[in-house]
Swiss-Prot record:
Pfam families: ADK (PF00406), ADK_lid (PF05191). This is Adenylate kinase. AMP binds at T46, R51, G72, L73, V74, G100, I101, P102, R103, Q107, R175, R186. Belongs to the adenylate kinase family. Its EC number is 2.7.4.3. SUPFAM superfamilies: Microbial and mitochondrial ADK, insert 'zinc finger' domain, P-loop containing nucleoside triphosphate hydrolases. The keyword Metal-binding does not apply. The lineage of its organism: Eukaryota, Metamonada, Parabasalia, Trichomonadida, Trichomonadidae. Residues 1-9 form a propeptide. NCBIfam families: adk.
Amino acid sequence: MLSTLAKRFASGKKDRMVVFFGPPGVGKGTQAKLLEKEFNLYQISTGDALRAEIRGQTPLGKRVKGIIESGGLVDDDTIMDILQACMQKNTDNNGYIFDGIPRTIGQVEKLDALLAKMGTPLTHVLYLSVNIDELRERVCGRLFHPGSGRVYHKVTNPPKKPMTDDITGEPLIIRKDDTPEVFNQRMNQYFGTFQPCIDYYSKKGILQTFPVDGQPIDVVHKKLHAALQ
């Protein structure tokens, strides 16, 4: 897989290789989708990829289901396998946004090694920081439409009809990993692993931090867009 991917990369320059860094639920996915269209990038969300495996009841999905739903971290090798598979399938772009990876220093090192072999090192690391109490309220109020991936919020972006998708009329769900108990577990995991990642990218001079507390999506987006210009 690696040699095939390297050959595909050699045929087209990747202008932007971007890591979106920050705790689960901070808004990385929302911002990534906006920037994806504007810069012809491809968003790779390891969280979405893992949940797709779970929905498909694949061997991998069955193996990681309990880990994801309890707020744990999937092992680094599995995450990197998923990342490479996503890159292999999507090469017609100007670069990638890595959303949800890296989350450990081991993943940082593996990602650097992979991209070095591709000849396409990271160009930007965008760190979205947020007050944890605000984040808890944001995450534990989320509602999802499984078929499309549309996201609502009980308070800030409610559906027109309670627990019902505005477009299809199908029921919305609350993910099992969006309960207060699992949120606390995920935050414990996150804060136990993220500081070495922050330090690593800071020393490389490619880390940019964007506080997002109380800021509208469009305000944050303008700042991120400017950072990638």
